[in-house]
Amino acid sequence: MAGALENARKEIKRISLEDHNENEYGQIYSVSGPVVVAENMVGCAMYELVKVGHHNLVGEVIRLDGDKATIQVYEETAGVTVGDPVLRTGKPLSVELGPGLMETIYDGIQRPLKAIKEQSQSIYIPRGVDAPALSREVKWAFKPGKLGVGDHISGGDIFGSIFENSLLEDHKILLPPRARGTITWIAPAGEYTVDETVLEVEFDGKKYSYSMFHTWPVRVPRPVTEKLSADYPLLTGQRVLDSLFPCVQGGTTCIPGAFGCGKTVISQSLSKYSNSDAIIYVGCGERGNEMAEVLMEFPELFTEVNGRKEPIMKRTTLVANTSNMPVAAREASIYTGITLAEYFRDQGKNVSMIADSSSRWAEALREISGRLGEMPADQGFPAYLGAKLASFYERAGKAVALGSPDRVGSVSIVAAVSPAGGDFSDPVTTSTLGITQVFWGLDKKLAQRKHFPSINTSVSYSKYTNVLNKYYDSNYPEFPVLRDRIKEILSNAEELEQVVQLVGKSALSDKDKIVLDVATLIKEDFLQQNGYSTYDAFCPIWKTYDMMKAFVSYFDEAQKSVSNGANWAVLSEATGDVKHAVSSSKFFEPSRGEREVHAEFEKLFASIQERFAESTD
């Protein structure tokens, strides 16, 4: 995008009739907000990048009709008049892929916001502003790979690597997917900027030179050798998600919820604590202060790598397209984000892309579609909404990357959806649920009760539970059984609560009372999590597993004692200390290490059995 824009601008300078052939430009015919119609555009291609007006505004052709082209403009069109020139660039909207992406914040069409601020000294983006997506001044220490002069090279092959930062130590330099040939020269190890030539290749008698970055059209998925089935969990550090509704690395997840339910908090905790190598966080049409919060918090958050503390900003790229930025760029920002994610996947990394929120993206589609006069479908959204969403989610997955050496990477998509009034029958939510495999449904009532994360366990689901059984069998053998038991206790308690409202708790049998009491315990001490504490902000999978064991063994021992004739009212009073110990297991500090915390849990399991045995004697 900005990469292509920058390259295009180098060639374009200012639009003037003397510099270009007449067939390279058209004229503006009509303007309607971000949608501009230009005439005399014969030979123009769909999705071609164009420059509109004397300010060189960036636009993209979205419809062709005779010699007229309809263009969506990614900048404010105030002041553009009929008859202004429109210049064709002959290339699609593309992003620059190379060293320097991490720790950077871009807008929806990959313009670096920090560089623009330094250049313009303004908090707003001036129209027609220019700044390359990847800094041309910074020098990177390039190390050539195993390939040498005379070797054949094809698309996706790694021909070198650079040290980007201490979290991304090995940023691989790839040959663009459609390139190939025989190496005639490769740069020796040393410091180079991203646009300096580091490789020369000959193919069919022609010489081609490549630098450390290349551009790629955002609407075209990057090719892979083979798609694989995903079978490793994407660990979020949220107990309710990791235990009951797990996602996989390479999976698709939807988080719908009304305002104030905590969608952004879940998205941000995924970025902070998930087991991903790189995070692409796309703030798509959300509030600007949420992006500001991310920018303030991320540099202060640390992850531990090989005993070193590293700020997680080093593995994060932000694409910020807030509500006050042009609508058309919001539509492009999702594609920008997924293309950046695919680039890191091609390096053999597990990437998470967080889109917050895809409802705003759909609203941008609705607005553009309305201006084009297309036939509206449900609630005014275009009829092709489902197809657009599917083509975006289809770019997720685990795959063997193109080229050699062999490497496997994955792109996981987590999309927040904000249906109006929290209504899950909204077209965006229903279309998304038909495509994604995991549904983390947020409940307004739980959020109002300050139950966070406010996941409604009765409506949420994950279709990856069976896929992950192999992982659980080799690491946590009882995990699937414990998960099913906890789900069973929660669903039974929900049915019993309706009975209690009719006849009161005293009318229930002791066994049913245990179900209700343990369900309350699970809801308050297992499903709830305090994101602002050291012990609970992130819960590792081994702590989640031991906590599940503790709750289920407490339930089983209680049921066993009641079956042997004990009275639950008396028994629960006598074993109050055990109940307190089980509920306090969330306070075990994970930073003490797995072995130490596991030893504490072993003591807890033993004390549960002892206390119930004593109380029933």
From Swiss-Prot:
PROSITE patterns: ATPASE_ALPHA_BETA (PS00152). This is V-type proton ATPase catalytic subunit A. GO terms for molecular function: ATP binding; ATP hydrolysis activity; proton-transporting ATPase activity, rotational mechanism. One of its GO terms (biological process) is intracellular lysine homeostasis. Belongs to the ATPase alpha/beta chains family. The gene is VMA1. Keywords: ATP-binding, Hydrogen ion transport, Ion transport, Membrane, Nucleotide-binding, Translocase, Transport, Vacuole. Its EC number is 7.1.2.2. It catalyses: ATP + H2O + 4 H(+)(in) = ADP + phosphate + 5 H(+)(out). HAMAP family: ATP_synth_A_arch. It is a peripheral membrane protein. It comes from Eremothecium gossypii (strain ATCC 10895 / CBS 109.51 / FGSC 9923 / NRRL Y-1056).
